[in-house]
């Protein structure tokens, strides 16, 4: 079976190299976040067995690893709802060439299971905490689980995680004024806060118009108060990360509406049903699943991905109001 050579590393026509795979393993979620699934998860009518199985996951991750991908983020939906989630982590972590295995979770199962996830090979975790006010957290997520999630973060440090990343979706009139509370929280904790601008998707146009707020004000505040921009690694995400000598924690800003946001794009997405998505806001998904059934299909799988990469756009078109085919962020893993 042919591996990619260095010259065949996944690369698009704009010479962007792809070191980072976001792999969704389910679109099911048990939270009802206002910016994602405000009415809760609505089953498609298909059985959950239609999601990628362990063998398919192993094959797609190996193909990406053989073509230069070194980081995999396991996403959802809520990925920990998969009964075989720990096995998925182990499968990804056991793949030659994969150096970092991450997941994004709502945190509700962390306190109980984070130890086994770490033992299986998980070495980076992102937890969604959209407010430090338990009542606002409940309002945004639809679940009264604030203290449970916070206990999960504490437990992550107890089992040996050196840093936990915390995602906060910025929303005007809901949580955009909580910066002082968040700064106080991370002063003596190795937490990287990641403020994410609300993004427009097919089903969330009204919410976007009501609650979108730019991260520029936060960035200006940080710079004015002595925070410094940190240099990125090749497989890091799109966050602008700021550090301060008086803070153990860090602040990241993800601002997709900013000019040149896509210039350093380094990630591709595979959905829980086995479709390749070149962009979170692309207008189509490319079927890969038919090439995930046998180990000897890897060269054909790689060829299909390489071919599709040449159609990847230079940028999304969010500023023109084009949100692509993504109905909500849970559908292809955010």
Swiss-Prot record:
It is an enzyme of class 4 (lyase). GO terms for biological process: Mo-molybdopterin cofactor biosynthetic process. It catalyses: GTP + AH2 + S-adenosyl-L-methionine = (8S)-3',8-cyclo-7,8-dihydroguanosine 5'-triphosphate + 5'-deoxyadenosine + L-methionine + A + H(+). Its EC number is 4.1.99.22. Binds 2 [4Fe-4S] clusters. Binds 1 [4Fe-4S] cluster coordinated with 3 cysteines and an exchangeable S-adenosyl-L-methionine and 1 [4Fe-4S] cluster coordinated with 3 cysteines and the GTP-derived substrate. Its cofactor is [4Fe-4S] cluster. It holds the Pfam family Fer4_12. GO terms for molecular function: 4 iron, 4 sulfur cluster binding; cyclic pyranopterin monophosphate synthase activity; GTP 3',8'-cyclase activity; GTP binding; metal ion binding; S-adenosyl-L-methionine binding. InterPro entries: Aldolase_TIM (IPR013785), Elp3/MiaA/NifB-like_rSAM (IPR006638), MoaA (IPR013483), MoaA_twitch (IPR010505), MoCo_biosynth_MoaA/MoaC (IPR050105), rSAM (IPR007197). [4Fe-4S] cluster 2 binds at residues 262, 265, 279. [4Fe-4S] cluster 1 binds at residues 29, 33, 36. It comes from the Bacteria. Residues 13-239 form the Radical SAM core domain. Keywords: 4Fe-4S, GTP-binding, Iron, Iron-sulfur, Lyase, Metal-binding, Molybdenum cofactor biosynthesis, Nucleotide-binding, S-adenosyl-L-methionine. Pathway: Cofactor biosynthesis; molybdopterin biosynthesis. S-adenosyl-L-methionine binds at residues 35, 77, 128, 199. GTP binds at residues 22, 73, 104, 165, 267-269. Catalyzes the cyclization of GTP to (8S)-3',8-cyclo-7,8-dihydroguanosine 5'-triphosphate. Belongs to the radical SAM superfamily. MoaA family. NCBIfam families: moaA. Monomer and homodimer. This is GTP 3',8-cyclase.
